[in-house]
């Protein structure tokens, strides 16, 4: 049987994994086996946290809207009910930015729902 010269195939594969784990602490960026395990774990966390990030931002927006609404003497749910009843279709992200950065406009929107 003839000898198979693999050349740089294994080195290339290991180098690719080690490049992905640059910046990890300790052996996780130096030793191939632990680096490979950490890379798999990091990818798993990344896919999980993409969904979690959407949840977290929605939660933050609701908290900010609630804070702005309570300054007007309303709860978050009462405010959103009024918006829906009046046909105001502004998403939570924009409402949160208004409540945080442009309180005058946010207060006018809340006042408009009273009419």
Swiss-Prot record:
Lineage of the organism: Eukaryota, Viridiplantae, Streptophyta, Chlorokybophyceae, Chlorokybales
Gene name tied to this protein: rpl20
Molecular function terms from GO: rRNA binding; structural constituent of ribosome
Short name of one Pfam family: Ribosomal_L20
Gene3D superfamilies tied to this protein: 6.10.160.10, Ribosomal protein L20 (1.10.1900.20)
Compartments, as annotated in UniProt: Plastid, Chloroplast
Homology family: Belongs to the bacterial ribosomal protein bL20 family.
Signal sequence extent: none
GO cellular component, one term: chloroplast
Gene Ontology biological process: ribosomal large subunit assembly; translation
Protein task: Binds directly to 23S ribosomal RNA and is necessary for the in vitro assembly process of the 50S ribosomal subunit. It is not involved in the protein synthesizing functions of that subunit.
HAMAP family per UniProt: Ribosomal_bL20
Main location: plastid
Keywords for this protein: Chloroplast, Plastid, Ribonucleoprotein, Ribosomal protein, RNA-binding, rRNA-binding
Name listed for the protein in its UniProt record: Large ribosomal subunit protein bL20c
